[in-house]
Amino acid sequence: MDNHEEKRQRRVRYNGTHPKVFKEKYKELQPDKYADAVAKVIQKGSTPAGMHRSICVNEILEFLKITPGQTGLDATLGYGGHTLEMLKRLNSKGHLYAIDVDSIELPRTQERLEGLGYGSEILTIKQMNFSNIDQIALESGPLNFVLADLGVSSMQIDNPERGFSFKSEGPLDLRLNPNRGISAAARLKTISQDELQGMLLENADEPNSAAISRAIISEIKKGIDISTTTQLQQIIKDALKFIPQNTRKDEIKKSCQRCFQALRIDVNDEFEMLYEFLEKLPATLAEGGRVAILSFHSGEDRLVKKSFQRFFREGVYREIAPNFIRPSTEECNTNGRARSAKLRWAIKA
């Protein structure tokens, strides 16, 4: 053996499934380095950590019928997946406005899209809530197409520092814009048991709302500061010990998901913002303008459905979706987060 032979470089050691630093936990957070790992996650029907896979892309584009020269709005920029596909359809002619309330993810998405060659001549990005769609219309003029994807992005869910998931330790925040409003932890300190129970019922249809709200308020009255996601998860878990052992694990998981959803909707005023958006929407559309809305919650879908139906009866919309559209079976099999999606559309008279 040649003693002068260069020593073989060992690969960088992966820190395991439970590292001290969250960023080292998932190989998917480094897609360029671990492309095979990302591919395996997608193949299993999951979304890689820190990434977002846009839903119903083909169905949305088929309906919006975007052509070069048009002006449109992506009312929920997020990761920019839908945005990118709409920009491709415009083919450097026309203009796309894209807005999002998230002050953390927006600049990252903007940088990514600019890196792909989509500058201010074709794309205008603003940090704002879609309830202010009328302000966009003042600048853009009548819109030929509008898309709103009401789902929380995977980047938000997978980042424990945002506090959107009970699966990881993190601050109990849940705000889409961390610079505005109060966190979920602060909200719990101001709410009564009756209010909390009503919130869990209205925002998430939680069947165990009475037991869970009673347990949460009991802890707060003891002077316990519920400031982390795992604290809240444990309280919910303890409150549901009465559930039979054979179904308890699944029921606790579902209740945790619903409770976090209910709190997120509350601290971000999501239903109120959606209602305001839907009310202002028709006035921003050009004649024949098309709008597609993707929802993931029965309460959101009801608001969209009722708004579309009312404006259709009043002659504001000339046509609306007769029923919601579900993602294809193939998409649901390859992206589990698509399973609860519902797509509705309307066309301005």
Swiss-Prot record:
One of its GO terms (molecular function) is rRNA (cytosine-N4-)-methyltransferase activity. It is found in: Cytoplasm. One of its GO terms (biological process) is rRNA base methylation. Keywords: Cytoplasm, Methyltransferase, rRNA processing, S-adenosyl-L-methionine, Transferase. InterPro entries: RsmH (IPR002903), SAM-dep_MeTrfase_MraW_recog (IPR023397), SAM-dependent_MTases_sf (IPR029063). The keyword Transcription does not apply. It catalyses: cytidine(1402) in 16S rRNA + S-adenosyl-L-methionine = N(4)-methylcytidine(1402) in 16S rRNA + S-adenosyl-L-homocysteine + H(+). Gene3D superfamilies: Putative methyltransferase TM0872, insert domain, Vaccinia Virus protein VP39. It is an enzyme of class 2 (transferase). SUPFAM superfamilies: Putative methyltransferase TM0872, insert domain (SSF81799), S-adenosyl-L-methionine-dependent methyltransferases (SSF53335). Its EC number is 2.1.1.199. It holds the Pfam family Methyltransf_5. S-adenosyl-L-methionine binds at G80, G81, H82, D100, F130, D149, Q156. The keyword NADP does not apply. One of its GO terms (cellular component) is cytoplasm. Specifically methylates the N4 position of cytidine in position 1402 (C1402) of 16S rRNA. Belongs to the methyltransferase superfamily. RsmH family. This is Ribosomal RNA small subunit methyltransferase H 2. The lineage of its organism: Bacteria, Bacillati, Bacillota, Clostridia, Peptostreptococcales. The gene is rsmH2.
